[in-house]
């Protein structure tokens, strides 16, 4: 029987004149939480349940659908800049590819909570008695009118207003602990359509008009409008329902809990959370909870205790041993009685029902077996009561009553709180750049890299910088390239420092944006001499002098603590800075002019570096002009013949060519500061591949912090691509990194370091195993909200796969799918 009598916003009246207020519980991220964090969530939920001393609670986990096309269309609104047309076409192609792979919609779990509103007793006086009699009489007339005419359902405006006030108080209580949203008529209708087999409609695309006719004393709605979402042919069999619509049919079966045969220990009892990851098909769950007050619960427990004592005495008098079941039950009852007496808590009558649907009977049987096995592993025995399918179906409807008393479980608030209601794995944004999908839930993951600086509610960082860490071949460069590419398509600008020259063919492999790709390949040819001279490359004279000091102290090893050499070097640099022709070669000339043993020694030391052809890029006589332009959307800077030191090489062991290579990286990275300080309205990226090479030297570390801080102020993100999280784990840098991506690692110390970098429990063996077992292209990701999950990076297009793949080519084509 359809229970709903009237709906007003989030209030639902049933045929017994009970009123429920329904809310959507905004899911909270539960993945990779520490045990302490899980207990905090558990306590909040337990308090939420325990605050109701009487009445009923109706909790629903519903597998709804969200439209992939709608999300992609929303993402298109974020696109700006010169490449807008290319980006729109790319997103459209991406949409078609995703729809062909996973369908128009993806499963999205939503959580609903309904609380029965308990009327406070009015003061007994003549006025209230008259009002009560009047309302009863009017209700009788309305019922007669509805029975005879079956058209309109009416509700007294006074009645509505009374419950609206009560609902406001309840909403205030709940919202202190969890994020909630009041339901609307559309939500109830969408829920009922789903329960009656109407699938394939995304919530965003669903409409449900519920016209109301407001009179002076009452409000009318059409009864047909209330029951419209339930329209379908329902055929009941012993173990399932067949739901038929004009264009589709589905089969639905219902399970209820027969017995819980073991302990559900928290944390590890979060059924609602784990079943989202376990099942590839939608599963709905209903918890109909009746609150039993503490006094009544104690009376029930003590009566049960008397029954058990009688059984024990009877066995004793008969000369038999008391069965182990009775002994265990007596222990449990004693413990429960003590607990209830001390805590003054309520008990809860729980009716737990699971709904499984499928397009045909064979698939329904397979899914039912899978659900039963999953609950069996948790020591929960399910049963599918024959002939009760329609009644159990009714338990899912808003404001419904418990259908059957045979399968009631008496539980405490701890048990209900430990089921993980509302827990899910959430990553990224609702719209933006599609980078892949969650390995655990299969949900698409979207990012908006420029969002951090906007101060969006809920974010735990305002840092635009990102880190990509992991061992060789895990996929960090691929992920980094993909994110930079789409950021440029969406209207951003990027400078990529490409020390290994892996991106030199992008103009050929990415023809759609070739005109906006600028590849600067710095060779040791004569025409390039001096292009990386600090005095030449920096626009500002002071910046050039500062960088010259950094480079020359780095190359010569002269420390600020060296009271003899340092002042001489700085004096020479300052004189060159003030001259007309500024260049590092002129610093040597200036030192020789001093003609002291110390100045000649420093001049000879610097001059020794110029003997390398490769070093000509760094040294100029002040006549070279800066020809490096970063005006394109995507700029790639390569330096031929760079020789980076090995990751484990200490600074003291660097060869001369390695010193020069790192010095050039520092110069180019500093040059990126000018790029960062360009148009603040455009999101910019400075991408530092092999970042460890200069993060491991003092000058590079200082520069990194400078880049990150400038980037945050000027709407620019610095992307560090490096092999070890230790390179970016120093507090000064770590706290300024927003998005984090960690790819596979097998070294235990590195794994622990990475988990610490993510703010996770580094000693947790499960966390370590997740990172160790990541496959190629999978990464641990932390978003701007501090949420962590495992993502499969998904380029969608094979041309992007080939363009961004930095692995050596193989002779035969491999099927990457």
Name what the model sees in each region.
Residues 53-56, 109, 490-492, 517, ...:
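Short glycine-/polar-rich loops that comprise or flank the Walker A/P-loop
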Residues 35-53, 276-279, 292-299, 380-381, ...:
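P-loop NTPase motor domains
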Residues 312-314, 450-484, 497-504, 520-525, ...:
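Conserved P-loop NTPase motor cores
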Residues 100-101, 540-582, 729-817:
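P-loop NTPase motor core of the ASCE superfamily
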Residues 1-410, 421:
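Extended, folded cores of ATP/NTP-driven motor/assembly subunits in large transport
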Residues 485-495, 509:
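Post-Walker A helix-loop "phosphate-sensing" segment adjacent to the P-loop in P-loop NTPases
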Residues 125, 439-445, 450-452, 457-470, ...:
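Charge-patterned, long linear interaction tracts outside catalytic cores
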């Amino acid at each position: 029987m359809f229970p709903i009598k009237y709906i007003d916003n989030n209030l639902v009246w049933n045929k017994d004149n009970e009123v429920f207020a329904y809310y959507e519980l905004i899911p909270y991220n539960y993945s990779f939480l520490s045990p302490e964090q899980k207990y905090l969530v558990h306590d909040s939920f337990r308090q939420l349940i325990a605050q109701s001393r009487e009445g009923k609670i109706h909790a629903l986990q519903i597998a709804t659908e969200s439209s992939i096309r709608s999300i992609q269309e929303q993402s298109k609104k974020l696109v700006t800049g010169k490449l807008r047309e290319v980006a729109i076409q790319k997103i459209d192609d991406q949409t078609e590819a995703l729809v062909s792979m996973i369908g128009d919609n993806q499963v999205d779990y939503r959580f609903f909570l309904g609380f029965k509103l308990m009327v406070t007793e009015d003061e007994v006086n003549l006025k209230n008695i008259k009002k009560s009699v009047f309302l009863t009489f009017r209700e009788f007339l309305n019922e007669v009118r509805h029975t005879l005419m079956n058209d309109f359902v009416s509700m007294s405006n006074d009645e509505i207003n009374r419950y609206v006030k009560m609902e406001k108080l309840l909403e205030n209580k709940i919202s202190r602990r969890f994020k909630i949203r009041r339901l609307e008529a559309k939500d109830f209708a969408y829920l009922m359509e789903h329960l009656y087999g109407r699938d394939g409609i995304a919530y965003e695309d669903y409409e449900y008009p519920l016209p109301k006719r407001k009179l002076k004393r009452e409000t009318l709605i059409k009864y047909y409008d209330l029951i419209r979402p339930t329209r379908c042919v329902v055929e009941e069999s012993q173990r399932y329902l067949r739901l038929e619509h004009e264009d589709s049919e589905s089969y639905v079966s219902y399970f209820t809990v027969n017995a819980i045969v073991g302990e559900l220990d928290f944390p590890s009892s979060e059924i609602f959370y784990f079943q989202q990851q376990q099942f590839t098909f939608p599963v709905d769950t209903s918890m109909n909870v009746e609150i039993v007050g503490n006094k009544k619960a104690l009376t029930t427990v003590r009566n049960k205790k008397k029954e058990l004592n009688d059984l024990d005495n009877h066995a004793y008098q008969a000369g038999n041993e008391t069965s182990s079941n009775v002994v265990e039950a007596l222990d449990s009852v004693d413990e429960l009685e003590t607990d209830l007496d001390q805590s003054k808590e309520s008990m809860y009558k729980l009716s737990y029902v699971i709904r499984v649907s499928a397009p045909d009977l064979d698939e329904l049987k397979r899914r039912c077996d899978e659900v039963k096995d999953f609950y069996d592993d948790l020591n929960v025995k399910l049963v599918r009561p024959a002939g009760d399918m329609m009644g159990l179906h009714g338990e899912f409807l808003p404001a419904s009553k418990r259908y059957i008393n045979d399968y009631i479980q008496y539980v405490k608030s701890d048990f209900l709180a430990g089921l993980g209601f509302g827990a899910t794995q959430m990553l990224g944004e609702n719209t933006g750049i599609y980078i892949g999908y969650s390995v655990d839930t299969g949900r698409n993951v979207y990012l908006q890299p420029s969002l951090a600086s906007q101060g969006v509610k809920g974010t735990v960082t305002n840092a635009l910088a990102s880190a990509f860490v992991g061992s060789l071949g895990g996929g960090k460069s691929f992920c980094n390239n993909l994110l930079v590419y789409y950021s440029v398509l969406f209207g951003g600008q990027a400078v990529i420092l490409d020390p290994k020259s892996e991106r030199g063919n992008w103009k050929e492999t990415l023809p759609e944006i070739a005109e906006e790709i600028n590849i600067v390949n710095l060779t040791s040819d004569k025409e390039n001499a001096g292009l990386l001279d600090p005095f030449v490359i920096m626009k500002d004279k002071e910046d050039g002098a500062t960088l010259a000091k950094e480079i020359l102290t780095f190359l010569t090893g002269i420390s600020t603590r060296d009271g003899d050499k340092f002042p001489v070097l700085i004096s020479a640099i300052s004189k060159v800075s003030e001259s007309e022709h500024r260049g590092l070669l002129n610093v040597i000339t200036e030192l020789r002019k001093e003609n002291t043993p110390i100045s000649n020694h420093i001049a000879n030391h610097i001059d020794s570096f110029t003997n390398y052809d490769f070093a000509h890029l760094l040294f100029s006589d002040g006549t070279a002009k800066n020809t490096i332009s970063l005006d394109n959307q995507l700029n790639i800077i390569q330096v031929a013949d760079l020789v980076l030191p090995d990751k484990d090489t200490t600074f003291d062991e660097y060869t001369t060519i390695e010193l020069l290579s790192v010095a050039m990286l520092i110069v180019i990275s500093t040059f990126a500061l000018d790029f960062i300080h360009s148009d603040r309205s455009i999101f910019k990226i400075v991408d530092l591949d092999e970042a460890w090479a200069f993060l491991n030297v003092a000058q590079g570390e200082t520069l990194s912090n400078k880049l990150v801080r400038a980037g945050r102020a000027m709407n620019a993100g610095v992307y560090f691509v490096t092999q070890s999280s230790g390179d970016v784990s120093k507090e000064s840098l770590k706290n300024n990194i927003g998005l984090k991506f960690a790819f596979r690692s097998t070294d235990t110390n590195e794994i622990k370091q990475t988990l610490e970098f993510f703010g996770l429990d580094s000693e947790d063996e499960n966390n370590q195993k997740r990172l160790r077992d990541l496959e190629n292209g999978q990464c641990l990701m932390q978003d701007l909200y501090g949420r962590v999950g495992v993502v499969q990076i998904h380029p969608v297009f094979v041309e992007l796969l080939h363009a961004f793949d930095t692995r050596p080519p193989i002779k035969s084509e491999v099927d990457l799918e």
